[in-house]
Curated annotation (Swiss-Prot):
This is Small ribosomal subunit protein eS27. One of its GO terms (molecular function) is zinc ion binding. One of its GO terms (biological process) is translation. It is found in: Cytoplasm.
Length: 84
């Protein structure tokens, strides 16, 4: 009968995602790049997920996202995808 019920050498993907970025088995960042599509003109803008400034559309100037001190908060009509 094992004393520990959790395998420390082979953690599950769910437990790795919950762990702090420096305490994971292989340290990985929490940030990523986004492609945001403007709902007004359809242009795509590439930005960082933790941007510190307001993101505006490059063509029409409509605001696409607001900084929150952490992750970027997108406007409700914007569609996005994570770049890999």
């Amino acid at each position: 009968m094992p004393l520990i019920e959790v395998d420390l050498l082979n953690p599950t993907a769910a437990s790795e995602a919950k762990a702090h970025k420096m305490k994971r088995l292989v340290p990985t960042p929490n940030s990523y790049f986004l492609e945001i599509k403007c709902p007004k003109c359809g242009a795509t803008t590439t930005t960082f997920s933790h941007a510190h400034r307001q993101i505006l559309c490059q063509k029409c100037g409509q605001p696409l996202g607001q900084p929150t001190g952490g992750k970027l908060k997108l406007t409700q009509q914007c569609k996005f995808r994570i770049k890999k």
